[in-house]
Every structure is written in structure tokens, then in C-alpha cells.
Amino acid sequence: MTAVAPTLAETGNALVRIDHVQLGYWVGERFHVAVRDASFDIAPREKIILIGPSGCGKSTLLKAIGGYIAPAGGTIAVAGRRTLEPGPDRAIVFQEFDQLFPWRTVLENVAYPLRINGRSRRDAAVAAMRFLALTRLDQAADRYPHQLSGGMKQRVAIARALALEPALLLMDEPFGALDAITRQRLQAELNGIVAEREVTLLFVTHSIEEALVLGDRVIVLGDAPSHVLEVVDVRDLGGPETVAYSQMRGRLRDLLRVEDDVAEMEDQAEHVDGG
């Protein structure tokens, strides 16, 4: 079930290629390393989960792949092109609910990136409605963000990201602030949408359960300054009741050094909240 991250020479069909990337930030005259050395590939239409301890650089690495942070070392390439800035081939969804424009309607929020990329108002609106229907929000097109629940706001953000028809969808703990029932519902919807649109997904989470529900492979990062501890294939495990699923959950807990009593409390809380 487990595998060491493949070397770059071993993967010839990668959409995303992370090659010995180092990331960090300056505090005065001192450079603090957040990600020491990360190398992995992502194949087209693959669902990759980044998981690791808090503060290990998961979100920093995601933003670097999105083109928002320049690596201090190594290279990031998408579709064979080195990533130096944001581009329409990548779209990102954050955790925060305030990522929508409060003065624009749901339809206008989704259409906005299409308009700034040169689409006519009519074409942008038609495309936006198509993706609102995909996320089951077409009936809320005329509402404003303050009239939406947290889950609905995240679905708008997903629709807006998908409207660009990116090759790579980047998601930074988008369901982390939602209640368990809404989170599980959106996880199921996301799996369906990604399969239908054939989008490549890179998803950051701190939840082992979420990683197992959403991922094809899970990339485990160590403590900061982090590196890739292991790349784990989580396909074909079956549901939570299977032995394979339980063994994989235990393996990921071991890699992340999660205490058994804390993990059990989280599982019990999710079971109660989820009904």
C-alpha cells in the first residue's frame, strides 16, 4: 500500500512536477525554511492530498504551486512549464468564507474571472450558470454572499474556480470550518465534480478521514522545516468498515504521530455529528 515518492526520471506523464523545492520566508535578515526539500509528481486527473502537522508548510507549498510564492530553491512545473506566477491553468479555493466579493451576486462572483479573461458579459454569465448548476447553486444565482450558509459559500468558490476550466484545482482546507454533516456532503459532491470534469486535484487537509475519502494518493509531510515523508496510495480501500481502510488509517496516524486517544475522540465526534 505504501511507496516511496517516485523520482522525476521515473514519471514521464506528470501534469505537475515538484523538484527539490525549498520554501521559506524572511524575518529581518534571517531566512526561515518552511519546506526543506519536496519532490513529487502529479499525474493528469489524479487526486492528491497533502497532509501533515500544523505549520509544516502544506499551505505554503500549495500557494507556491499556484504561483503565489516563489521557491527559494528547486523548480515547480505545470504541464512542462516552470511556474513563476498565477495562471488560468490553475485555480485555488481557500478555507476562508470571505474569498467572495460581498457586493457581487453569486452569478457575478462566478462570472468575474471569466470577464477579466476577456469573455463577454453574456458568455461569462452563461458559463457561470453552467457551473452553478454543477454545484447545485443555480437557484441562488441572484443572492449575495451574506445570504448564504458557509457550505453554500464554499460551493460558490468551487464553481468560480471550475469556471476557469483549469487543468489543476488547488484547495486549501476548504471544508475545515464547516460542520461535519456539511463537510461530508461537500466531500461527496467534490468527488463527483472532479470525476465529471476530469480535473486534477491537489487538496490540503489536516484530517486523515478526509484524505482517505478524497484521495488517490496521500503525500505526508513531516514537521517544519518539512520534507516528503512518504507517498501513500489510498485507492481501492473500500469503506471505513474494511480492514484495508482501518490499516491505512492506522498507518497515516503512525506517520503523523497522532495519539490514539486524540484520534478516537475525533472519530467519535465525526460519527456523532454525522448522524
Language-model region placement:
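Hydrophobic anchor residue at the start of the ABC signature
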Residues: I158
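Short coil-to-helix segment of the ABC ATPase nucleotide-binding domain corresponding to the Q-loop/switch region
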Residues: R104-A111
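A short, flexible loop at the N-terminus of ABC-type nucleotide-binding domains that lies
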Residues: L8-L15, G24-D37
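Conserved ABC transporter NBD signature motif
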Residues: G74-P86
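Helix-to-loop junction immediately C-terminal to a conserved catalytic motif
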Residues: G66
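Conserved ABC ATPase "signature" region
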Residues: R115, R122-A140, G192
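Catalytic Walker B motif of ABC-type/P-loop ATPase nucleotide-binding domains
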Residues: L169-D172
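Conserved signature/switch motifs of ABC ATPase nucleotide-binding domains
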Residues: R143-H146, L164
